[in-house]
Amino acid sequence: MLTFRKDFNVLSGETLWRDLPGGSGGLHRQHVCPECLTRTHTEMLAHPDVINVRPGTLDNPAVATPIAQIWTSLAHSWAIAPNVRCYEENPEDIEALVGAWRANLMA
């Protein structure tokens, strides 16, 4: 779930992180819970204003209604949600996608 960095904070505890190359070759900083090593969120270093949050780690995952799926080129056909935007890889304009998510959240 993409969101703007200014709208995101970790509510409790600290995370561990590591930098890994993403599909585009750019570095992504992946944050994990230090106790269970579950990924919580990812910073896309090429897009410093955007954070990718894992919805299952939210206190209220109901706020994470999908509006799009990325990297569908690697997904099984049964895993692609109907009625959402699909991108075979990363979308060209991530900020526009985040804006669409925010508009959906406010609706």
Predicted feature descriptions by range:
Residues 1-107:
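A short Gly-Trp-Pro
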